Amino acid sequence: MRLMSKLLIGTAMAAALCMPAAAKDLNKIGISVGLLGNPFFVATIKGIEDRAKEINPNVEVISVSADYDLNKQVSQIDSFIAAGVDIIMLNAVDAKAIAPAVKKAEAAGVVVAAFDVSAPGANVTVMTNNVKAGEEACNYIAEKLGGKGDVVIINGPASSSILDRVQGCKEALGKHADIKILSDDQNGQGSREGGLAVMQGLLTRFDKIDAVFAINDPTAIGAELAAKQLNRSEFIITAVDGAPDIEKSLASGNSMIKASASQDPYVMAGQALKLGVDVLNGNKPAEPIVLLDPQLITADNVKDYKGWTAAR
């Protein structure tokens, strides 16, 4: 009789181990993004909120801006843990230094879903293929310059997305021996104001520039504003994002900004949340890192572009 009981207990335990984890309710989400003032992150938050409310109409969503400050973002993650969030949706401001904070969150039983930028240790990551985005934007430059000229790169914060874009740009330009990169280490902070300030300095420093690659659209807009202020119009500008302001610039036909490798922040962040919920429910994704292809937007095809503000 005892033997039979032991066998039954053993069988029950084995069956329990084979069963999938019980579904957990999605009650609270914490979102930390690089800069809330950037329309890109407005679209990501909407993508997360819309997908979350499909799962639980009463879900609580807490959105905060790290302002590209690592210490601030680490503090935000600590606050999310203390608040008992189920998932942290993370746009890391530093692709490497954020790792201990991610580890701490997961040790507390919180799922971390990274979007737009990789974060070491995150359960899932969804982002644009940023190497390809930088490559496409700078292939456009090389083509328009006929493989010859002087180019500046306006860099940004040390996130993986920006590092990858610059890498892709350099790889594209590096195929042309007669293209010279005059500067690639000036940080425009991913903002219009930063792009303006950096471009003012570059225009003062260099008498002739043939093209500018800006790591995102706000930076590109700031660069164009600086050029107008200093009466410089000899160069073209390309970027990455496909933001609403860039749509208008491309459609106008009279902007120095000629192309942007577009992203879909709404879809990107929503997909990251979906994968995060899968992890929350004990289902490990087959592909924990998902790369989305960019689309190069120019004056020639902008009319067919479904942008960030399009109806969903």
Feature names for model-found ranges:
Residues 3-8, 17, 22-312:
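A residue-level marker of the well-folded mature domains of exported/periplasmic proteins
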